[in-house]
Amino acid sequence: MRQSYRYASGAVVRRTLKGLRKLILCQDLRQDIRHLVRSYADMNISLPISAPPGWRLDFVEFEDIFGSAAVTDGPETPWGQLICCEESLESLGVLQFSTTVLPRVHGPRSSSEDEDSDDDDFFVYVEEIEPPSQARLVLLLGRYETVWCLDRDRGVLYYLAHSLDDFARHGLLHCEAIYGEQMRTPLLTTQPDHIICDLRLHDNSISELQRVTCRYRGECVPLRTPGEMTRPLLLCGQAENLKGVWPFICMETEQFNDLLKFFVDRLCCETMIMGVVGESLPSGVFHADFVILVDRACEFFYFDVSRREIWRLADSVDMLLTVGLLKIYQAGRRFHYAVDDAERLEVPGRCPHENFPFWDRFGTVERVRASTRHHELRYKWLIRKDRFIVRPDWCSMRNSLDEVSGTADVSWDPRIRPDYPQTSDLECAKQYWQELNDHVREQTARYGPVRRYSVWCGMSSRLERAVKRLQQRIPRQNLMNPSLMNQGLCVYYSDEEEDQEEDDTSDDDDQEKETENPQNNIGSLTRTPSSPGSLEGVEERMLNVMKEAVAEQDRKKTQKKHKIDTAQRRVLTRRAARAAVLEGRPTPKPTMPHPVSYLPFWM
């Protein structure tokens, strides 16, 4: 789904762009960017982020964040193993949240939002900045104004925006990293309150969550996403309730059962259908766009009806009620390791560098040099006062509020521009051909090799055993036949108890190592010889008995938690093994009704 054009008011967007003015002008030279960040850091100034309120960018140098021994270029950089292509990113600073240091807020404005002041109020001065080395989020700037965010705690790299203007319009509102548990972001979806309370109280097990969902089946929950329109979530609870929604109402029994098997096969564990997200149309039938699924660990996933794929949606009920469908809007902007993505069913990162060679062709003309680039003109065009004007009495006026917003606003993809130099044009310009060829080769070398995104690169011994067992169960002709794969053939441990003895054996070994901890035998280690008849001996024996009882309770809790973790780890291993076996092969997809089957037989 395509996100909205902007999440902040026109005045806030212009104020943020004014704060980014020098970055826009000096983006071609890395040394100028570093010098600018150093000067801002010496002045202790920060730039408020446009959205959401309270977030700011503290300008900090690279050495102060990662240390003097950190590498700034190549695969050894802090983000070198995460980014899709080897690109030189410049550190702008760290992202901090504070409710005490906020920019000056203007009063309510009329529809003519362009009359914001030209005062230099786009920076805030912070007296005390938290230690940058302990900061969790780092903002990075790439070529052609691409903006990245590095989550140091989780080891995840996010592609935030394709330009500084895009970053000013959207801010961090769709950055998944700011909605962590430590931030305690308030819930967006709060109504109906009785349904929300029951869902939050019974999110510990899938059986309790299913019982609550079945109690409210047929009810609609307005699922809210930050900055986007509210979508209705129709609660189902059971698979049979899915047959009353479009297009599943057109599916035959066998086809519907294959779809349910696909859900279980993809998640590698028991699955609950929580509900569907779609639209309630005047036809009286609810049209589903996404099916919300819940696995054994009460983690949420979505099935895209049009793409026929299952991906991760939220880690818990609270996260679902906080971010809504945020992961669907930001699909492909999260860069992590292939094994972890396969275990979590995250959408693999989509390389944004495919546009760079296209943009490079505009700079291959001999007369185009760094001194003649129109960065200043672009900046003035972006901060023009009439950019966000809303005049309802002018029906013939188009502005940046529309989807077709003009060259400097949205038409950033060079492949859709009519002035893009085609191959035939380049062949005709023989005097520039050699220069173009050398320039493209130079830029390709600058980007560096593409990172090998493969599950086989992060293979562990447990995962290797799971892959071997899975390959033995799947007939080779089924894997090599694309027609069978496209018909919905799934690779899965069909039996839940398959090879359980082997897994339990390895798990028991790990459990014995964990339980053989000296702290678990506090009573036996703290005993000292004393006379049996003395008062001190009686008190000591009672104390030892109490310690042994407490240690036994802790041991039982640890074993129970270990058993749950073992079951969940087995599920994650199966998902990674499934991804490894299917790597390079057609992805299994269920068969969905064709639009022809929607029509009545007399048509």
Curated annotation (Swiss-Prot):
Compositionally biased spans, kind Acidic residues: 496-513
Family annotation (InterPro entries): US22-like
Start-end of Polar residues biased regions: 517-533
Disordered: annotated span: 496-536, 549-568
Family label: Belongs to the herpesviridae US22 family.
UniProt name for this protein: Uncharacterized protein HHLF5
